[in-house]
């Protein structure tokens, strides 16, 4: 529900409504679950798909992601009924949500990405302060080849810095200076995704109750007003 809110801009109730239709059509497993674990069938079919389509080095079977506090785990995690079905017929919204579920399921069984973090500090003669930049370079994409987790900060998702290869003691030449004026922002207002995360942290409700809880807060009682992200 959180990722559908971030990536697809679906409301919680919209996500659950679409997921219900996918379940009724037999495209996904039971969607009102708090489990993060997959069945042996899902593990084996995911491994075969990954090895056949990406190579064995991209496969890493894992099934224990840790149990959330208060989780009942009566069902396995939400997943496609058949891993080989990379797409389905249906409405554009149904196809988008299915694609999200499919990619997250398969990516969860792929190898970790390997990155190298670079931290460059640049000094100048006669200046005490140092300029600093940090970035990461992907050595092996692993699960990133298929899926990248989003955050509640669109700017963070969009920013990507690629640094050149440098060595300690290299001399650099100034090619231009640009000054940016930035201000400390007030805490962000809740989105559907961040509100669900807060409910999880406070152990309030379960996946099956998040949608009606948020609907009650916003529509039924008007405790919360939903608006655009600039307000």
What are these regions (language model features)?
Residues 1-231:
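Core catalytic DNA strand-manipulation module of type IA topoisomerases
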């Amino acid at each position: 529900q959180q990722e559908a809110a971030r990536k697809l801009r679906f409301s919680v109730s919209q996500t659950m409504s679409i997921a219900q239709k996918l379940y009724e059509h037999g495209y996904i497993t039971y969607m009102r679950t708090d489990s993060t674990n997959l069945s042996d069938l899902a593990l084996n079919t995911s491994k075969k798909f990954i090895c056949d389509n990406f190579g064995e080095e991209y496969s890493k079977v894992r099934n224990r992601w840790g149990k959330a506090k208060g989780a009942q785990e009566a069902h396995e995690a939400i997943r496609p009924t058949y891993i080989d079905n990379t797409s389905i017929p249906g409405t554009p919204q149904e196809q988008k949500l299915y694609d999200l579920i499919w990619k997250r399921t398969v990516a969860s069984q792929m190898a970790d990405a390997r990155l190298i973090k670079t931290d460059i500090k640049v000094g100048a003669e006669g200046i005490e302060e140092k300029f600093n930049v940090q970035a990461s370079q992907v050595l092996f994409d692993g699960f990133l080849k298929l899926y990248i987790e989003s955050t509640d900060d669109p700017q963070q998702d969009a920013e990507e810095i690629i640094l050149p290869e440098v060595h300690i003691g290299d001399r650099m030449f100034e090619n231009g200076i640009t000054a940016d004026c930035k201000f400390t922002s007030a805490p962000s207002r809740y989105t559907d995704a961040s509100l669900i995360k807060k409910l999880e942290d406070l152990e309030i409700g379960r996946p099956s109750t998040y949608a009606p809880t948020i609907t009650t807060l916003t529509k039924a009682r008007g405790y919360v007003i939903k608006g655009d992200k600039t307000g």
